Amino acid sequence: MTNSIIMIEHEMKLKLELDNLVVLCGDQRVTYPLNKIECIVLDNMNASITGRLLSKLAEENICLITTDKKHLPIGIYSPYYGYSRSSKMLGAQIEFSRCGGQLWTDIVRSKIINQAKTLELLNFDSRVVDNLISYANSVEIDDLSNKESFAAKVYFNELMGVTFSRGNEEILINGALDYAYAIIRSMIAKVGIGCGLNMHLGIHHKNEYNDYNLADDLIEPFRPIVDLYVYKLMEGEEFFSSSHRKDIINLLYKKILYKGLNIDIGQAIVEYVKSFAKLVRENENTIEYPNVENVEFADERFVFDHYIDDYIFTEVERDEL
């Protein structure tokens, strides 16, 4: 993933000028080329953005994520049309969604194996690891016996403790997990739309009120990678801060061995979603699932702050750019 992720953390105005993003604060300004931007995270509820810029972001398939008062992602702005042959792809996707049971089986199995490996990497009880591997090996077509749910309970009880609940907002790490999952989900949705996929049409998730059912399917094997990263990041911390949010965005730039290449996790997401689109379009399965053991969580940060008086415009990008 060669482009940058832009975070807007303060009260600023975003506008379009000659195919550039312009960030204004008073009479101060920062300009950044749109063709170098992957995503913009609007992390301040008083920041504003012009209609012309919104239109251009959609045209260029640049993802815009908005957050709530707790700084958690709450919305994704993405193109209405993302592909020149979207109607043809839609037909293929509808047909595929009727017979995607084997793919969901593979996704669930990959997720549970990564959960087991996450516990193993953190030196948790080997008996629990073996139990999860057993769950993974016994997943049925379309996971009719719901091994995913059973495995998740065993996994989180071991990782976080038996009193842990993913729905409890008072547990600090839940906010960090929600933030990280939302960032990965947004990237999957962005790439999927660019491939002509309709994100409403899930393989397993079928919620009529969810615009991103497919993203919620495809994200599953990446969740344990997020869990491991966030677990290490938040260990011993008392607050979920702006610094943590930047570190979580940096997860997209951590290296992973994927399809024989040492690439960014963000680029692995691109290749992963493209492989799914190829399966739908051509009935050729080249999907490789991410392996948590192949991720390098090096202590690197590619964060550069552009100061506008007392305000900060944060750019998160690759080291070689």
Label each region the model flagged.
Residues 31-34, 166-168:
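A short alpha-helix capping/helix-coil boundary motif
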Residues 36-85:
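Glycine/small-residue-rich interface belts in oligomeric ring/scaffold proteins
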Residues 13, 29-33, 54-56:
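Short secondary-structure boundary/capping segments within folded domains
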Residues 2-5, 11-12, 59, 71-321:
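Active-site helix-to-loop segments that bind/position phosphate- or nucleotide-bearing substrates
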Residues 17-24, 63, 139-140, 173-174:
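Short low-complexity stretches enriched in small and charged residues
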Residues 11-14, 19, 33-45:
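Structured surface patches comprising rigid loops and adjacent beta-strands/short helices at the edges
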